[in-house]
Amino acid sequence: RDLYYGAADIPALPESLAALHENAAAYPRARRYYTSGLLRTEQTLEAIYGPVAHQQLPGLREMNFGDFEMKSYQELKDTAAYQAWIADVEHNVCPNGEGAPQVLERNRAAMAQVLASEEDAVCVVHGGVTAGLMMTWFGGGRYDYSVKPGTGFTVTFRDGKPVSYERVPE
């Protein structure tokens, strides 16, 4: 059952973690590692990289879906509040939650901390965070950068600016 979960601190699926561990060699290594601090990012980092030292950046957390947290499309589809939100998810705010502009600003501020160093870094973050940052850096729409759990992008920066990307794992 597909749920809206952003702020909810739910675990990753055990079978997903096992698959990540089996494919760990497909992921890039770095000198620095970051997570959002939510359990599923902590578990994902450990499944791929083992017990590596890392920093938690709460600014990299997914959207707080407010009243929609842990609810499915089926539960929400006929409500006026949900219909109002999905009419423009890039600008509207979830009741008692956040809107995409707030989340993106929070995510960008956290990424500025990561980018302050020129050392390579791995950030284990959420799909919405990934899509929002990629849209900001490379243009396009949110769905151009959709990721499944355990996938993402390697982004190359020069002089603090994003210049290219490739999907990971390939």
Language-model segment annotations:
Residues 1-52, 98:
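Active-site-proximal alpha-helix that buttresses catalytic centers in soluble enzyme cores
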Residues 10, 48-106:
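Phosphate-handling substructures
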Residues 31, 117-128:
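Generic beta-sheet signal
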Residues 34, 55-57, 166:
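General small-molecule cofactor/ligand-binding pocket signal
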Residues 35-36, 105, 124-125:
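Short beta-strand scaffold positions
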Residues 40-42, 62-63, 129-132:
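Short, active-site-adjacent cap segments at secondary-structure transitions
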Residues 47, 132-136:
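Active-site signature of alpha/beta-hydrolase-fold catalytic machinery across serine-
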Residues 140-166:
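Domain-level recognition of soluble alpha/beta enzyme cores
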